[in-house]
UniProtKB/Swiss-Prot annotation:
Protein encoded by which gene: hflX
Species, as recorded: Bacillus subtilis (strain 168)
Record's protein name: GTPase HflX
All residue ranges annotated as the Hflx-type G domain in the record: 201-363
GO MF terms held by the record: GTP binding; GTPase activity; metal ion binding; ribosome binding
Pfam families assigned to the protein according to its UniProt record, in alphabetical order: GTP-bdg_M, GTP-bdg_N, MMR_HSR1
Cited InterPro entries: G_HFLX_dom, GTP-bd, GTP-bd_M, GTPase_HflX, GTPase_HflX_N, GTPase_HflX_N_sf, P-loop_NTPase
Disruption phenotype: No visible phenotype.
Amino acid sequence: MNEQETIQEKAILVGCQLPHITDEHFENSMEELASLTKTADGKVLTSVTQKRNRADAATYIGKGKVEELKALVEELEADLLIFNDELSPSQLKSLATAIEVKMIDRTQLILDIFAKRARTREGKLQIELAQLQYALPRLTGQGINLSRQGGGIGARGPGETKLETDRRHIRNRIHEINTQLSTVIRHRSRYRERRKKNGVLQIALVGYTNAGKSTWFNRLTSADSYEEDLLFATLDPMTRKMVLPSGYSVLLSDTVGFIQDLPTTLIAAFRSTLEEVKEADLILHLIDSSNEDYAGHEKTVLRLLEELEADDIPMLTAYNKRDQKLPDFIPTAGRDHIMVSAKFEDDAAAFKEAIQRYLRQELLTSFEAHVPASEGKLLSRIKSETMVDRFYFNEENEQYDISGYVQEEQSIIGELKKYM
């Protein structure tokens, strides 16, 4: 990690509350902006908010607030302003002229965190693509800002020099990235098809950012994911084997955390993680039961899944942090839910049991077969490709009496039918 990434910049947060936004939603949104700032290695000095009928077309907030901000920047020696909404190119230009300090908006802040966290080649390419697409219409407006922004929050990824080059260069780079990404995506698609062909069930772990997905991903798969109490800790898809209590193996994918007010363009930029969701046989939806806005977080995830056309995939909901759950917490997911906490050792086994039970009820078909002991190859396949409940050797008939569960479309079904 270089020195630039460890510098803690001092930030003032700026928010504009419009009539359709409730006080509670606005407060949660500003708190989340503070968490995002912390994740990006920033230090929040204070927040400046204003209630308006509509955002000022020129400066987002009113002229008086702009003057107040200018004075605050000098008084608190702030390094940057972070706006809670996406600023238009003209707003950015006007504000940069009025206040001599670096400024970014919520979208840039999220992109910056994406750039900081990405680890795979595809993740890095997609972040650069999203940043360039965001920067292209803002080149003129940001000119003043970029020349004095230096490093720090909002400067990761493509970098200052790329953003200051002409539009043609950026468009060429966007074209190059799209070409490279299409190759990577084709490769991943072939890999996913191969996994499907092998008959392995795929489960996607989704949830609002910071709900505890990476912790549970590690616990359920014994993998070394990036576990930290920071927003967007996971950006690249991670898929690992998870062994259920019966010995049946499935694939579990960890995904980037969802967030409210996330522009659709940002969702599109992270196809790598979200494709895993669309291809899943089952979605595990993790919700932080200790968060005061847990119901809002749940709605956000469900809405984004609908936008991804993944809302018809079977879902098991897990309410996390049950040891810290709110006193008035009420599960909203109906019968298909479980309460868990990573603090309790036994909950990992209970979580796996719940997943296994759900698979049996909703996705697998029960079978009974009596397979001759001489069918060694088939017996081996049964152990690896089905969820076995009973595997008893009948000495009298020299056969194995087997019962369990299997996917209906698996090729092994044809072999099993001979002995059912």
